[in-house]
Curated annotation (Swiss-Prot):
Gene Ontology CC terms, in alphabetical order: cytoplasm; extracellular space; plasma membrane; secretory granule lumen
Modified sites of kind Phosphoserine: 54, 105, 108, 150, 152
Site annotation Cleavage: residues: 52-53, 83-84, 91-92, 97-98, 130-131, 145-146
Pfam families cross-referenced by the UniProt entry: Hormone_2
InterPro entries: Glucagon, Glucagon_GIP_secretin_VIP
Modification Arginine amide, positions: 127
Entry's family note: Belongs to the glucagon family.
Post-translational modification: Proglucagon is post-translationally processed in a tissue-specific manner in pancreatic A cells and intestinal L cells. In pancreatic A cells, the major bioactive hormone is glucagon cleaved by PCSK2/PC2. In the intestinal L cells PCSK1/PC1 liberates GLP-1, GLP-2, glicentin and oxyntomodulin. GLP-1 is further N-terminally truncated by post-translational processing in the intestinal L cells resulting in GLP-1(7-37) GLP-1-(7-36)amide. The C-terminal amidation is neither important for the metabolism of GLP-1 nor for its effects on the endocrine pancreas.
Name this protein carries in UniProt: Pro-glucagon
Record has DNA-binding as a keyword: no
Record bears the keyword Nucleus: no
Leader sequence segment: 1-20
Amino acid sequence: MKTIYFVAGLLIMLVQGSWQHALQDTEENPRSFPASQTEAHEDPDEMNEDKRHSQGTFTSDYSKYLDSRRAQDFVQWLMNTKRNRNNIAKRHDEFERHAEGTFTSDVSSYLEGQAAKEFIAWLVKGRGRRDFPEEVAIAEELGRRHADGSFSDEMSTILDNLATRDFINWLIQTKITDKK
């Protein structure tokens, strides 16, 4: 339906513009005989001005028409939404979203803090071995001594444990800063 109105309006403006242009020509140059095609125009600038004027008039009329169509469409949309107001209100209540900015930022900051605390607690409790308690793991390591390399294996295990303990203490003592 809109396209029919659009085409009809466009046709009316074209016909009106051509009538105005024809009337202007007859008013400015009243001739008793038709001009031949080979006859040169007296002033080419005058012809360009007429052409620009008619194009400007058409563009102006066309933009006014489009503005009025937009206004009509907007009024029609307002009337339709007023009629269906209850349906729209229910739909918006069902799918109402939370505020994007602050709520999401606060939740993500909270979740990051919780994840860091859980990771530190996991490191303190299990140090990577969830299956065995600390005492059982050390007793097993001492029971698996070999003649060659037992001292170096035992020493590296102790050093690893000390390094892990120092790292965990450092993590616990340093404050977690917020990302910005």
